Amino acid sequence: MLSKKFTLRSHKSSITYIYPHPTIPSNVFTADSSGLIINWDLTIRRPKSSWQAHTDTILTISTIENNNSNNNGDGDGDGDGDYYLLTHSRDNTIKIWDLLKFSCLLEIPCNSLNFTNIEIFNDLLFTPSSINSNNLDVYKINPKNWQIKRLIFDFDIYKLVNKNENENGNIIQEIGSDTITNNRNDFGIIMQMKIIKTITTTTTNTTTTTTKENQEENGGDFIIYLGFESGDIVGLQLILPPARILSTTNKSTNTNTNTNDKTIIYNQSAKFILKYHNSFHVPNPIICLSNLNSILISSSITNKLIIHYNPIIEIKNLKYSGIQSIVYFKKFHQLIFGYWNGYIQYDDILIKQNLPKLGTTNNNNINNNIDTDINQEQSKLTKKLTFMTILNESKQEISQTSTTTTTTSGGDKSKYSSLIKSKRNFKLPLLLVGYEDGSIVAYNI
C-alpha cells in the first residue's frame, strides 16, 4: 500500500524533475519550471542548498562521472567518487555542475524547441538535433578536461527505418500498423528518449562471452529508444568502430629513455543500426517511456500501456488516459502510474491530492441539491501530477550512517541523537511525487 509520509515545500513553480543523489540515498535534487534546483536532505526534510541553474523549465537531470579527477565533485566531501550534475533546460542549454562550488564547468547549446528529455550513457550524450527536432545528435564528453566532440550530426531516424523496410533480408519489428508512415513522410518531433541496457556478446566456436572491449566497440551494451510525435517507437544501437592507434617513439642512444612519443588516435564514423520499430500507438504521440527490468514500456495520450517483449508486445488497458509518469518498484516487481489528472495508481490502490476547497455552509435554507453539486465538483479538483520517482533501498545508506556516527564528537550529543532519530524515521523505499503547485509528496511503499 501507499501511505503519505511527508511533504516538501520550497518550490514556487511546477516540479519538472526529481533525481536521487548518486551516492547519498537520503538526498535528492528537485527542479522546477523556473530553472531552480534544490538539494534536499530527506532525513531532516530541509533544503541543503539551492541555485538558479537555468532561466527556463528544467527537462532533465542526470550525472556524469569522472573516475580520474583529483577533485571530488559530488558535493558531499566523502571522497566516494567524482560525480557531476548534468542539467538540461528549455533555455536551450545543457550544463554540467561542480557540486562543491555550484559552478558551471561546461555549457552546451542544444535544441529545446520540443519537450523531450535528453539521455546520457557513460560519456555519450544523446540530444535532439540542433537543426531538426525530428533527428538526433550524439556527443562524446571527456570529463578529464570537459571537452566535447560531436560523433553524429542530424541523424534521420525515419530514413533509416525506411531503408531497412525496403532492403531484402532485413526484418524490422513493426507491430500495430500496416505502414510505417501512416500517411506521413516523417515521424514528427522526438517526444521521449530512453536508454535501456542490454547484454552484448561475442560468439566463438565453443563459447559466448562478453568483454569490455566488445562493449566499447559497440558504444556500450544498450539500446536507445525514441518515441515520436507520430506514435512510432524506434530502438537504435550505436556502433563505435575501434580506434586505430599509430605510435611513434624515439629513444636516446645514450640513456635508453624516450625523448619523443607521439600517439595518433582516429576513428571511422560512428553509426546507428536499427534494432526495433513499433507503431502501435500511431497516431497518438508518445508521452512516456520507462524501463521495466530492462524491458521497454510505453504510453501515449490514451489509456493503453504497451510492454515491449521484443518482438512480442503486451497491451494493458489502464483506468485513466494520459499517463504522466511510470516507475518500476523492483522489490515487488510492480508498476506505479501517475496520471495527468493527478491520480496515482499502485496495483488496485488509487490516490489523489485534492486542491484546497472553498468553505461550505450547512445553512438548511440553501438548496441542498446545489450544495451537493458544488461539493461534487470541488471533489474532482485534484493537484496536477508532474513527475514521479522511487528512492530504493541501498547499502550506501548503511555506510553513510556508520560514517556519520563515527565522526560525531561527544560534545554534540543532542545533535547526534536528533540525527539518529531522523535516520530511523527515514525509511526506504519512498515514492516521491511532484505537483504543479511546487509541492513534493513522499509516500512509503
From Swiss-Prot:
One of its GO terms (cellular component) is nucleus. SUPFAM superfamilies: WD40 repeat-like. GO terms for biological process: chromatin organization. It comes from the Eukaryota. WD repeats lie at residues 10-50, 53-107, 406-445. Keywords: Chromatin regulator, Nucleus, Repeat, WD repeat. It is found in: Nucleus. Component of the ASTRA complex involved in chromatin remodeling. Component of the ASTRA chromatin remodeling machinery complex. Belongs to the WD repeat ASA1 family. This is ASTRA-associated protein 1. It comes from Candida dubliniensis (strain CD36 / ATCC MYA-646 / CBS 7987 / NCPF 3949 / NRRL Y-17841).
